Amino acid sequence: MAELVVGMCLMVLLVGLVIPKVDVGYAKAEWERRKLCSEIRYIKRRNLAGVNEDIRVTNSDKKSAYYIACRTNLLKKVEMPENIRMETLIDRIHFHTDGKPYKAGTVEINYKKKIYSITITPISGRILFKEGIYSSAK
């Protein structure tokens, strides 16, 4: 019984030393990229159905955020966690009723030196994100 208690104490000490040093920022950045990609695909489907919704990207000194709006009504506001930046030349992500984007380009989500990218293709309006060997995020 004493061996079991000593073994459990050692395990708790080891876990206590390892867990605080884990950087979850990369996982958060990946999660935000997947969430934003899903939101863009949702907006595209809504615009195909004739609903006039768009995503507006804003950057302040400390935080990045995006807003989902239908004409002038704000539907949703999503702020990026600390140290995660969103950079793009597209300030408004919006699609025609046939699926073509008004502006095509790339949205990048940065955490430290890793870059996660979402690309909106010009003519077809496909929403892609690069992973693995195809991505600049190594």
Regions found by a protein language model. Name each.
Residues L17-C37, R45, A49-D54, T58-K138:
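N-terminal helix-rich module
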Residues M1-V22:
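N-terminal single-pass transmembrane signal-anchor helix
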